[in-house]
């Protein structure tokens, strides 16, 4: 839903937001459902969105099950600097794709944190954690799996967005 097919998947998204309590997949109560968009397995949310939007914005097509082998994602998308100078330095196509990625990230967490059910997030998701497109980092260098605290500082606006959504959920 977040990275494409919005109109085709709106009914499924509504059912998910309501924790599948009404309809053919009724699970009972919201507390029985974990809502998430990324976990420690597979791509991080940021990497998945980079792959999806790089494909759509840069001219190729998004394959089913996007991963690092299906889309050639420019490294600059993973390392994105969202300052005006940073976006100006990557060219208009990549800057547009990065803006779409950030908007989709916010939509994804907005859906997760305002949905019925128990929210779950990958550590570092709040600052656009990346494993640079690696969908299976189990045997990778430890630096790939570490949390990048410099990135957290650089993406503090996104952290603030997550914090506001968490506060809204608590209220």
Stretch-by-stretch model annotation:
Residues 1-28, 127-164, 168:
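Active-site-proximal helices and loops of the catalytic beta/alpha 8
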Residues 1-121, 127:
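Conserved alpha/beta catalytic core and glycan-binding cleft of carbohydrate-active enzymes
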Residues 171:
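A glycine-rich beta-turn/hairpin centered on an aromatic-Pro dipeptide
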